[in-house]
Amino acid sequence: LNRFIDQVYFNMVKIPAGKVELRDDRIKKEWQVQIKPFLLAKYVLTVELFYSITNRALNGNENSNKPVVNISWNDAIMFCNLLSKKAGLKEYYSVSNSGQIVSCNLDLNGYRLPSEAEWQYACKAGTPGYTYGELQKIAWYNENSNGQIRDVGKKEPNA
């Protein structure tokens, strides 16, 4: 287990403070968000890491370097809390007994999901506009993956 906790810690990337332009095309609105520095995992969550922390196999597989897919937002925040607990950090999310009410403990140091603004800012990696690089080089999608989920870390970073 410690190997996985260390793997998470050492694969975090420090994202510097800055500003990001967000937009909602449905309501034709744009706005700017100030971003504080934060840490973001270098890779998306893998099936192997998810299993090592939760002891829950996805699709009968526990040793895969493929990304976790088809889990709920609640599953994701429960993973963050469990990872925090196992790493000796304070849980970022508080969840009611019913699971219906979630609050964020902004002053705590636990693992969490990035906000929409943080995610956009990190994806842009200092580039202007809404394109992040040559798609073929930085992402798997239907045309270049043969419709298969691929291992993480096999494409160029977007920065």
Identify the function of each model-found stretch.
Residues L1-F4, L58, Y93, G153:
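N-terminal intrinsically disordered, low-complexity tails enriched in polar/charged
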Residues L1-V8, G99-V102:
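A short, compositionally biased domain-edge/stem linker segment
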Residues F4-N59, P67-S84, A122:
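A short glycine-rich, aromatic-capped structural motif
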Residues E62, W73-A159:
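Functional-site microenvironments in short loops/helix caps that host divalent-cation chemistry
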